[in-house]
């Protein structure tokens, strides 16, 4: 159950980050007032996802040691890098991909210890 909550916290946080990116992409080049920006559905999705992710994270911290749970959040780096590359078509260089592999290796190593 704890690992499912940890995964949910990661996914909600990533959803919030992606929604933030979509919100600012929609604002780019448009001369929008702050009241118009506040009505962006992407912004509200970001706030909801990040707020929900925070609440789920608090549940995770009640069930898992922070020394186990927090390093697992580095999976967000991996997920967001994949989304940046394949959804937003952002360039990702070889050094960045190597970092992603190191993060995956670190998470796997820490996951075996827990």
UniProtKB/Swiss-Prot annotation:
EamA domain mapped to chain residues: 39-112
Topology of the protein relative to the lipid bilayer: Multi-pass membrane protein
Stored Pfam families: EamA
GO biological process: lipid A biosynthetic process; lipopolysaccharide biosynthetic process
Gene Ontology CC terms, in alphabetical order: plasma membrane
Segments passing through the bilayer: 41-61, 64-84, 91-111
Keywords for this protein: Cell inner membrane, Cell membrane, Lipid A biosynthesis, Lipid biosynthesis, Lipid metabolism, Lipopolysaccharide biosynthesis, Membrane, Transmembrane, Transmembrane helix, Transport
Compartmental location: Cell inner membrane
Pathway listed: Bacterial outer membrane biogenesis; lipopolysaccharide biosynthesis
GO MF entry, a single one: carbohydrate derivative transmembrane transporter activity
Superkingdom: Bacteria
Keyword Lyase: no
HAMAP family: Flippase_ArnE (MF_01869)
Assigned protein family: Belongs to the ArnE family.
Subunit and interaction comment: Heterodimer of ArnE and ArnF.
Function text: Translocates 4-amino-4-deoxy-L-arabinose-phosphoundecaprenol (alpha-L-Ara4N-phosphoundecaprenol) from the cytoplasmic to the periplasmic side of the inner membrane.
Protein name: Probable 4-amino-4-deoxy-L-arabinose-phosphoundecaprenol flippase subunit ArnE
Organism: Pseudomonas fluorescens (strain Pf0-1)
Gene designation: arnE
């Amino acid at each position: 159950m704890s690992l499912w909550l940890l995964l949910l916290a990661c996914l909600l946080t990533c959803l919030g980050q992606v929604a933030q990116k979509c919100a600012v992409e929609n604002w780019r080049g448009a001369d929008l007032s702050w009241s118009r920006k506040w009505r962006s559905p992407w912004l509200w999705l970001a706030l909801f996802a990040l707020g929900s992710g925070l609440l789920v994270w608090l549940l995770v911290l009640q069930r898992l040691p922070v020394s186990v749970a927090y390093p697992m959040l580095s999976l967000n780096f991996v997920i967001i890098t994949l989304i940046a590359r394949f959804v937003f078509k952002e360039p990702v260089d070889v050094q960045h991909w190597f970092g992603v592999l190191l993060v995956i290796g670190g998470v796997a190593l820490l996951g075996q210890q827990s």
